[in-house]
Amino acid sequence: MMIVVTGSSGFIGKHLTQELILEGHGVIQWDRTHGHDIKDFQIDQDVDFVVHLAAIADVRRSLKEPEIYWETNVEYSKKIFNICHKKEIPVIYASSSCVHAWWKSPYGTSKKAMEAIAHPGQVGLRFTTVFGKGARETMLMSRIANRTVKFATEHVRDFIYVADVVSAIKLFLKQGVEGKDSTYEVGSGKGIKVCDIVEHAGIDVPTQEGQDAEATDNTADNSKLRALGWEPTLSAKEWVDIRIAVEYTNKVAPVR
């Protein structure tokens, strides 16, 4: 297949693009790293699918810069959705679990708006808290890996491994979007308190109240996705255990 991936140099986009290329698909990488600005999006060749991952994330930043979130996540997405609808190209796009409490932040609002303007044949995947190699340094699991956690909260998070997110996207590329629902939740389906996963990692920090703009619990109902044959493979605790084991091994038997 020929697949356009917007945001292909981002966290999820990079993992997805690498797998698609290895599997022999043609991939058009649409992002600034490859000389394409999302505001100039166009399709001038035969394309089988568009995976729209380009966006500005980060709930806290959106409180300070709401305008850029609306412009990038909504206005530019609207252009992409309309172009693909006119050309009858199916779309898989990145939504967020933030839509369940969208009013709390400009980021959540922008994702809720994205879902509202999407056309039939355009499926939104509501990612929960994605972790893995390449995630932003400010994300909790990155801070755990780097031992830079300063405090924890009692907010509940559904951590989902980036490889499992990629497998969800690939499932729709394989099965197509015909007959599918407009949105699916992509998460492990199991929530864990932030303070508990931090403690599991052996990090001792104070527990504080989380920000009002953040969801208190983003645990996904992934039953619709599971019904299509998808299953998560790696939990947050398992990932932390692997990190701890690797760190210990490197200390007692460093690679030479």
State where each predicted segment sits.
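Adenosine-cofactor binding site in Rossmann-like domains, unifying the SAM/SAH pocket
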Residues: 27-42
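N-terminal Rossmann NAD(P)H-binding glycine-rich loop of SDR-like oxidoreductase domains
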Residues: 3-23
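A recurrent short beta-strand within the Rossmann-like NAD(P)-dependent oxidoreductase core
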Residues: 129-130, 150-157, 169, 173-189, ...
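NAD(P)H-binding glycine-rich loop region in Rossmannoid oxidoreductase-like domains
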Residues: 42-72
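NAD(P)-dependent short-chain dehydrogenase/reductase
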Residues: 104-108, 112, 116-166, 170, ...
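Amphipathic terminal alpha-helices
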Residues: 235-256
